[in-house]
């Protein structure tokens, strides 16, 4: 946010209050302008429709938005289904789901941790 980026959270959680509890415990609630939970929307990532409220809210073309997530088959494929870029956090790269999808779903960028995100985003317009 300090660098001018607007942040929203899209979660596949089945229980909306649980998402807020976890965010409060991690002191992350204030980082996000809006939070969308599949339990409320009725669709889960990778379905493109879970991204539609965020696209409407931020009022930007999908090509100007990116999904940052650690699951290729949900987060990155979902971003692509919605016309967005996908940035893969590789901390869970060895999970069976990610191993299965590694050769089929290609993110626009990969980072090992969220600490790498600000430098990546500073150069993002030049990379796209």
Indicate where each model-derived feature is located:
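Asp-based, Mg2+/Mn2+-dependent phosphohydrolase catalytic module
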Residues: 5-6, 10-128
């Amino acid at each position: 946010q300090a660098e001018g980026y607007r942040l929203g959270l899209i979660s596949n959680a089945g229980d909306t209050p649980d998402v807020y509890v976890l965010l409060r415990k991690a002191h992350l609630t204030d980082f996000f302008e809006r939070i969308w939970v599949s339990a409320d929307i009725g669709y889960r990532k990778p379905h493109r429709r879970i991204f539609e409220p965020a696209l409407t809210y931020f009022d930007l073309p999908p090509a100007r938005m990116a999904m940052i997530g650690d699951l290729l088959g949900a987060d990155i494929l979902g971003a692509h289904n919605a016309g967005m870029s996908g940035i893969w956090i590789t901390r869970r790269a060895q999970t069976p789901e990610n191993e299965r999808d590694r050769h089929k779903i290609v993110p626009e960028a990969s980072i090992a941790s969220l600490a790498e995100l600000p430098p990546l985003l500073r150069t993002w317009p030049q990379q796209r």
